[in-house]
Each structure stands twice: as C-alpha cells, then as structure tokens.
C-alpha cells in the first residue's frame, strides 16, 4: 500500500493483528510459521503459535477465564536441541521432533509452518491420494534462520 515494510519484533499479538499484513513467528531464532496475519491467527499451524494465541488476553473472553501459559522453560541457546527447538515444551512432540528440524509445510497460499505434525498430516493426505493438500516444501528450516 505505501511501498514500504517494517520489521516489528514483539510478543504483543494485539498490535500484530492491527499493524501487520504478514507474520513470521519465531522460536529460539528459528522461523516456525509464516503467513498472512488472518491465517496465523485463525488457523495456526505450529504448536508454539497456538500457545502464544492461547496465552494472550482476549477482549471477548469472560473476565474469569484464566490465561493458558506455555509449559516448560525457554530453550538454552548456548546448547540448543538438535531437532525442533520447541519440542521439549510441545504437548504433541514425537521422537522425530527431538532429532531433526521439520520442513515447511504449505497450509494455504503464502502460509507455511515447520512442524512434524503438519508433515504427518500431509503424508496421510498423500496416502489418501489428496496430493493438492499434501504440499511439503523441500527446504529445511535450518536454512531459514
């Protein structure tokens, strides 16, 4: 619109929703999800993104609703894990999550997430013959630091 861009680094997702068109969600220096702001907010593909959204106050929530924290402790950046950096805190972590970074999986036009759960979803779709929804990018997350 204005032929300019701004890199806005924040945990304030309310401001992100108001200011941004595109969002890159990072955890421990790795981009784990990227896409249009509405896709990220209404169809998050990475467990960290989902955790961020669950942990923020909502205007439409009842006043007695408690925020849901992301369990665990942040990754030790001096000794990062081999696999997905969020795996030790992820309630859905599988063995492969601890061993290897996942590839990006397309979740829609210009929306992708780096999560082995999404890869499993894509593999299931491919087995069913739904190749349109089984879109796994060959680029590894490590190259997108």
Predicted regions and their residues:
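P-loop NTP-binding/switch modules centered on Walker-like glycine-rich loops
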Residues: 1-65
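Charged, flexible cofactor/metal-binding loops and thiol motifs
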Residues: 37-132
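Long, low-complexity, intrinsically disordered segments
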Residues: 138-145
